A protein has these predicted regions:
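Positively charged n-region of N-terminal signal peptides that target proteins for export
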Residues: 1-4
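Bacterial N-terminal signal peptides
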Residues: 7-16
Length: 158
């Protein structure tokens, strides 16, 4: 009789274990998926998120070479650093200047008006050296990790 009791107990434990929800392991669709990281960068289920992409183009008021231009660009770089430090500016960089295309900003926002206000604080915009075009952009949420990676690969960060 004890053998039957232990056998029955073992069977119930086995069946019971199968009906209890298991602790969640890796996602079978993507074993590398990190839900904590995904939430931190604002990722949706596809690993994407919304941004505002800003294209900087040559404006109507070219500032000639000299102290005023130097000071304007010094302020431009300081403004980008401030916005990046605040977690608002995700990516920035220059274009080749062809067809008046001067640079690119990607902001961690989906609100064009809010982004317009942030961009208006840049001296190159305020002085008319450049004008900005605003576009909603849907891209990888991993872009939010670029700043931390940049600091690891830039020998002389900006």
């Amino acid at each position: 009789m004890p053998k039957l009791t232990f056998a029955a107990l073992g069977l119930f434990m086995t069946l019971g274990a199968g009906s209890c929800p298991a602790q969640q392991g890796p996602d079978p669709q993507n074993p590398a998926y990190d839900p904590v990281l995904a939430k931190a960068v604002g990722a949706d289920e596809r690993g994407m998120r919304g941004y505002v992409l800003v294209v900087l183009k040559t404006g109507p008021n070219r500032i000639p070479a000299g102290p005023e231009r130097d000071e304007m660009f010094k302020g431009h770089f300081a403004n980008m650093k401030r916005l990046s430090d605040e977690g608002k500016l995700v990516l920035a960089g220059p274009f080749d200047g062809v067809d008046g295309w001067r640079g690119l900003f990607i902001f961690a926002s989906t609100d064009i008006e809010e982004t317009r206000q942030l961009v208006s604080t840049d001296p190159v915009i305020a002085k008319g050296e450049m004008v900005a075009e605003f576009h909603k952009y849907y891209g990888t949420a991993a872009l939010m990790l670029v700043r931390d990676l940049y600091e690891r690969v830039a020998q002389k960060p900006m």
